Amino acid sequence: MSYTINAVTRTEIGKGSSRRLRHAGKVPAVIYGPGKEPVSIKFEHKDIINIQLNDDFYTTDLTVSIEGKEVKVRVKAIQRHAFKQLVEHIDFMFA
């Protein structure tokens, strides 16, 4: 199954801006890989909460649409809230 996530490039980075994003219902994320510059992105929490429950989400290549440009990525790490059903941050790698 293929998954597509619509994202926007983040201009502010850091702990404070990430907290503001989470309070607004968004998830901060980063895409990195060898030979490429890291890209900080954000997307809606509702876009990720249901698809991350599927097992193949972690093993298949995903498509992230960053302001109209599609990028193939793979999930590297997910940080979740300690007791709430919330995703706090995701690390993607370029596929």
Curated annotation (Swiss-Prot):
CDD domains: Ribosomal_L25_TL5_CTC
Keywords: Ribonucleoprotein, Ribosomal protein, RNA-binding, rRNA-binding
Record-level GO BP terms: translation
Domain of life where this protein originates: Bacteria
Transmembrane segments: none
GO cellular component: cytosolic large ribosomal subunit
Pfam families for the chain: Ribosomal_L25p
InterPro entries assigned to the protein according to its UniProt record, in alphabetical order: Rbsml_bL25/Gln-tRNA_synth_N (IPR020056), Ribosomal_bL25/Gln-tRNA_synth (IPR011035), Ribosomal_bL25_long (IPR001021), Ribosomal_bL25_short (IPR020055), Ribosomal_L25_dom (IPR029751), Ribosomal_uL5_bac-type (IPR020930)
GO MF, any single term: structural constituent of ribosome
Listed SUPFAM superfamilies: Ribosomal protein L25-like
Function: This is one of the proteins that binds to the 5S RNA in the ribosome where it forms part of the central protuberance.
Family assignment from sequence similarity: Belongs to the bacterial ribosomal protein bL25 family.
HAMAP family found in the cross-reference section: Ribosomal_bL25 (MF_01336)
Quaternary structure, from the entry: Part of the 50S ribosomal subunit; part of the 5S rRNA/L5/L18/L25 subcomplex. Contacts the 5S rRNA. Binds to the 5S rRNA independently of L5 and L18.
UniProt name for this protein: Large ribosomal subunit protein bL25
Species the sequence originates in: Shewanella frigidimarina (strain NCIMB 400)
Source taxonomy: Bacteria, Pseudomonadati, Pseudomonadota, Gammaproteobacteria, Alteromonadales
